Amino acid sequence: MVQQNALLCEDKDRFKFTIPLLHDKRLEYSFSGLKNQVRVEISKLETITQKDIADICYAFENTACEHILNKLERVFKLRNFKRFGVVGGASANLNLRKRLETLCQKNGCELLLAPLAFCSDNALMIARAGREKYLKKEFISHDKLTINPRVSFKKIEI
């Protein structure tokens, strides 16, 4: 939906969002600040038109892509890849795919992408895994679950 609306953008300079964690040396991603910037800009509008939606989606999509590429460029400086694969819902975004192709070409690396038909939201993969567990009657009591919505990965092995 973001991609389709971004393609309708008429004023590419109307909204400018800050790239999250731009100067943060960690390889972690965070889109919460970017989502908040979008929320703030939307709250400034009296009414929301299709043009507003298109212009905001364009700015959001490009800033999100810049954020991802910024982190990946750091990863590519740490390690030489022969092949680099991207999966999940974000891999369906054509803007991101184009930027990933450029990054991989620049680094002499083969980019592996699934056909668009197989690039869906990860929720489907999680649901499928849950279905398989259910069919095998592999259950766990809810009181044995540990839920941490703010889990931190201190070290990422590359």
Annotated model-derived regions:
Residues F84, E101-I126:
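Conserved phosphate-binding/catalytic loops in two-lobed NTP-binding clefts
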Residues M1-D52, E101, E132-P149:
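A short helix-loop
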Residues T146-I158:
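Glycine/Thr-rich phosphate-binding loops that ligate phosphate moieties of nucleotide
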Residues Q105, D121-L135, K155-I158:
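Claisen-condensing/thiolase-fold acyl-transfer catalytic domains that form or cleave C-C bonds
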Residues F81-L100:
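Glycine-rich phosphate-binding loops at beta-strand->alpha-helix junctions
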Residues I68, G89, A127:
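Residue-level signal for inorganic ion chemistry
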Residues L27-E28, R39-G85:
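Adenine-nucleotide phosphate-binding core of ATP-dependent small-molecule kinases
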